[in-house]
A protein has these predicted regions:
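ABC ATPase NBD coupling module
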Residues: 32-36, 91-107, 133, 139-140
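Conserved ABC transporter NBD signature motif
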Residues: 82-90
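Conserved ABC ATPase "signature" region
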Residues: 90, 141-158
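Conserved ABC ATPase signature
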Residues: 163-167, 171
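Conserved signature/switch motifs of ABC ATPase nucleotide-binding domains
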Residues: 165, 183, 207
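Hydrophobic anchor residue at the start of the ABC signature
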Residues: 177, 205
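A short, proline-enriched helix->beta-strand linker immediately N-terminal to the Walker B motif
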Residues: 182-186, 202
Length: 241
């Protein structure tokens, strides 16, 4: 369940509405003739709204389903039941081709800046991959876009030729942010984006996210367990328990 802290954030229209969202993971026994003997209730009947241009903080204890909720919104996993309405479209009901097109509108910044980047790819290829997948830019245009994104997140264009292991944790998270921005999304799920970073670096990344939100008119769902961080960045807070 969630409890939303009410706070005035203006009269912005709703971009995302989650209604009665449920995700149960089945527990099975047996190998050849397996059968379901129970279920883990990862997300159990949650509802909330997110308005355009705001940051909704999503907090709760470990294991309460925060990260699962983020992945359900992006349809990285399928819900058991419930509605996820993004800009008037019910995500669980969309066919695959429409969902693929909609993915440009919604991106995610992962918690682990070390594990979320392919160590065999250069930074330029990592950031440019979404542009290739969604056929947004190729060749010289793609390289130009990658350079622009690197500079936007506080890195340099020459970093495009380097590999992830050559960067610090904070720099890697900036690369992850640049990758999320590549397709010009409207909604970004920030899945504990600073929890793996040193305290001295956390503030820099938070400030960067706030600056990018203003520059690109972004909407965030900021998932975290640190209430101080959530209070600093969020317009409203939803508590999962």
């Amino acid at each position: 369940m969630t409890r939303q802290q009410t706070a005035p954030v203006g009269q912005n229209e709703v971009l995302l509405e989650v209604r009665n969202l449920v995700k149960h993971f089945p527990i099975r026994q047996g190998i050849i003739f397996s059968k379901q003997v129970g279920a883990v209730q990862a997300v159990d009947d949650i509802s909330f709204t997110v308005r355009k241009g705001e940051t909704l903080g999503l907090v709760g204890e470990s294991g309460c389903g925060k990260t699962t909720t983020g992945r359900l919104i992006l349809r990285l996993i399928e819900p058991t039941s419930g509605d996820i309405i993004f800009d008037g479209k019910n995500i669980p009901q969309l066919p695959k081709d429409e969902m693929r097109e909609l993915r440009k509108e919604m991106q995610i910044i992962f918690q682990d800046p070390y594990g979320s980047l392919n160590p065999r790819m250069t930074v330029g290829d990592i950031i440019g991959e979404p542009l290739h997948i969604h056929k947004l830019a190729r060749g010289a245009e793609r390289e130009k876009r990658v350079r622009e994104l690197l500079e936007v997140v506080g890195l340099s264009a020459f970093h495009a030729r380097r590999f992830p292991h050559e960067f610090s944790g904070g720099q890697r998270q900036r690369i992850g942010i640049a990758r999320a921005l590549a397709v010009r999304p409207r909604l970004i799920i920030c899945d504990e984006p600073v929890s793996a970073l040193d305290v001295s670096i956390q503030a820099q990344v938070i400030n960067l996210l706030q600056d990018l939100q203003k520059e690109f008119d972004l909407t965030y769902i900021f998932i975290a367990h640190d209430l101080a961080v959530v209070k600093h960045i969020s317009d409203r807070v939803a508590v999962m328990y």
